[in-house]
Amino acid sequence: MHFAFPVLIVRYETVKKLVLAAALLLASHTQGWSMDSLSHFTWKNRVLLVFGQTDDAKVKKQITTIRAEEAELADRDMVVLHVTQNNVTPIFGNTGGIDAQALAREAGADGNSFKAVLIGKDGGVKLRSEDVVGSVALFDLIDRMPMRRAGQN
């Protein structure tokens, strides 16, 4: 009887260490999917990043599509940013000083070619597209997100 109790403690301690190690591994892996440059938006806003040169036809179309939906953007707590190689320009919402190069690096974009990236309120990447994202498709995706559904109840 006296030997069983210390063995149980050792097993509990071993399990505790394994759970801690797994939690740390999961946290470090999840962090790789987040956008650190946008951390001040976490839990407050969804962010749509539109990468590409200002004169790119897809960039122009994406921005025009988004600007036509300001009420919908506001309803979904969104911020929209146009990111070129060296600049970040707010399209919708309040923004602070954001490093364009760090943002492009974190999103896997070069800032020259078109890419649309949606970041959820949790800071995770929810969508990457090399094609213009229509407003209906964008809002449908957002409306299916658990945080959005929870906010509507």
Which sequence ranges carry the predicted segments?
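Non-catalytic interaction/Regulatory regions outside core domains
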Residues: H2-N153
